[in-house]
Regions:
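Basic, alpha-helical nucleic-acid-binding regions used in initiation and control of genome expression
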Residues: 2, 8-66, 71-151
Length: 151
């Protein structure tokens, strides 16, 4: 992945966190991106960022926008998805919960399918370890999801 894409993802997440913490209307709009039936109401935000709302990147950005709206702070987390799942299940005797969720994610063939699998996973992570997941890393991973060399 190019540095410009990484920079764009990082900048996007930082701006979404910053702006949604200051603007309740924007926060409400970003939350709509989580639901496929209402995500089109958040598309103007994506269009301003130059995201093709008819392309596969739209799903990655919508998922991360909706999660950013649920963050309480203005800073991105530091944990990768795997690390966050491991922390969620740290007190369990087995790590089967985390590993089964990751295995299910690995079987996904598209960003759209990954989005459906990730939504409940991300809700669990946000409820157990709030604001610790690195959204910019998640966005970068989802953007390159369909490229064979990255899987």
């Amino acid at each position: 992945m190019s540095d410009s894409k990484e920079t764009k993802a990082l900048h996007f997440v930082q701006k979404m966190l910053e702006q949604s913490s200051e603007d309740k209307g924007l926060r409400a709009t970003l939350r709509l991106a989580a639901n496929p039936n209402t995500e089109s109401r958040a598309w103007p935000v994506l269009i301003r960022w130059g995201v093709d709302v008819s392309g596969p990147e739209k799903d990655a950005y919508c998922l991360v926008m909706a999660l950013a709206a649920r963050y309480t702070g203005k800073t991105d987390g530091t944990l990768s998805l795997g690390e966050a799942l491991r922390e969620c299940f740290a007190n369990d005797n087995e790590s089967s919960g985390a590993s089964s969720r990751l295995r299910r994610l690995f079987t996904c063939d598209s960003v759209q399918e990954a989005k459906l699998v990730l939504r409940p996973m991300l809700s669990l992570i946000q409820s157990r370890i709030p604001d610790r997941l690195c959204l910019s890393e998640l966005l970068e991973d989802l953007i390159k999801f369909n490229r064979e060399w990255s899987r």
